[in-house]
């Protein structure tokens, strides 16, 4: 037990006639008081008795062991506010009773764990003597006009809120993700229990819903009860029952601005112009298609007539060739007697040549 935190400071004077008091102050860390509350001097016996009561009710604290007085080190002065109120929890004359209606439990005699950075800490001062003492609770309400403290709290909350996504973005592995989600406080417990539990992997959520198998870089997943899941996903969601209590919050008013009628008229006019242009475009496109169709039909008919004429010409040439061949055969048969006459003429010439030779 520390002397500065477990005992009261220098003797103080109490203006009231009570022998034993419990005073509780609550406020923000940055609050300051212009003057402390008045108190009377405690005797050495009462201080020893107060220390004995605190030692009989030990309570573990995350920071230091607590006594009958607990305060944060950064709060040095107290703020005197006109709205502070003191409420006696028991009669001043009844000192022999074991407690009063508002006497706090023994657990409230000791400081609570130190709050986090995002929450304002509360200062609690408990000074108790005998079990039948008088308790006074003094509350210091928060100031609404303290803009500096509110700004500091908001900046601390923003830093605490942005630190978690930044840690998630910087981590590149599942171990980093799990460490970022668990926080710095759970790192030691995670290291201690790493041997007993299974490490988180990518397929651990999939293994709960089906079978996962890996082949190289490919991961195959087979879902269990696929038909049931499809049937459940297609089922309509149940309509929540209408509550009998009327809705206290008014329905949100639509934020759609009023529509300008000139805009509607311009839109209608432009739509009509666009429709007329589209109609004219479709008509021109239809006429062009008809002209192309007629030209295609004319080309097809011309090609058909040319093919028919060419076929007839080829047929006529084939017929003339066969006719010529037939005439040549007839001529050959007609020239066969001419060859006999040619032989006779050659014989007559030889005979004439012999006769001429004899006459000389």
Curated annotation (Swiss-Prot):
Comp. bias regions, Acidic residues: 144-156
Modified-residue entries (Phosphoserine), positions: 130, 173, 204
GO cellular component terms given for this protein: BORC complex; lysosomal membrane
Record localization: Lysosome membrane
Record has Metal-binding as a keyword: no
Polar residues: bias regions: 23-35
Gene Ontology biological process: lysosome localization
Protein's gene: Borcs6
Function, in words: As part of the BORC complex may play a role in lysosomes movement and localization at the cell periphery. Associated with the cytosolic face of lysosomes, the BORC complex may recruit ARL8B and couple lysosomes to microtubule plus-end-directed kinesin motor.
Family of the protein in this entry: Belongs to the BORCS6 family.
InterPro entries the UniProt entry points to: BORCS6, BORCS6_C
Protein name according to UniProt: BLOC-1-related complex subunit 6
């Amino acid at each position: 037990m520390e002397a500065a935190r477990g005992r009261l400071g220098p003797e103080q004077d109490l203006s009231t006639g009570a022998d034993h008091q419990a005073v509780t102050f609550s406020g923000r860390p940055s609050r300051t008081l212009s003057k402390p509350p008045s108190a009377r001097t405690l005797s050495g016996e009462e201080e020893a008795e107060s220390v004995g009561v605190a030692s009989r009710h030990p309570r573990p604290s995350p920071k230091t062991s607590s006594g009958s007085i607990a305060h944060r080190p950064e709060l040095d002065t107290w703020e005197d506010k006109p709205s502070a109120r003191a409420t006696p929890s028991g009669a001043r004359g009844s000192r022999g009773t074991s407690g009063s209606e508002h006497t706090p439990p023994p657990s409230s005699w000791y400081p609570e764990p130190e709050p986090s950075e995002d929450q304002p800490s509360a200062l609690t001062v408990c000074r108790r003597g005998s079990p039948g003492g008088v308790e006074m609770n003094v509350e210091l309400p928060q100031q609404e006009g303290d803009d500096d403290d509110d700004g500091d709290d908001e900046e601390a909350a923003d830093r605490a809120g942005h630190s978690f996504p930044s840690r998630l973005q910087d981590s590149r592995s599942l171990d980093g993700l799990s460490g970022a989600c668990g926080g710095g406080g759970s790192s030691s417990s995670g290291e201690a229990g790493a041997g007993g539990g299974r490490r988180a992997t990518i397929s651990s959520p999939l293994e709960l819903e089906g079978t996962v198998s890996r082949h190289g870089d490919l991961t195959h997943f087979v879902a269990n009860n696929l038909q049931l899941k499809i049937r459940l996903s297609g089922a309509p969601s149940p309509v929540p029952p209408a509550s009998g209590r009327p809705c206290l919050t008014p329905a949100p008013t639509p934020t759609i601005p009023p529509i300008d009628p000139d805009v509607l008229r311009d839109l209608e006019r432009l739509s009509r112009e666009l429709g007329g242009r589209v109609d004219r475009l479709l008509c021109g496109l239809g006429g062009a298609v008809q002209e192309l169709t007629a030209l295609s039909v004319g080309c097809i008919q011309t090609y058909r007539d040319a093919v028919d004429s060419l076929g007839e010409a080829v047929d006529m040439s084939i017929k003339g060739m066969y006719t010529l061949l037939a005439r040549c055969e007839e001529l050959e048969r007609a020239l066969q007697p001419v060859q006999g006459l040619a032989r006779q003429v050659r014989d007559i010439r030889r005979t004439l040549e012999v006769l001429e030779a004899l006459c000389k």
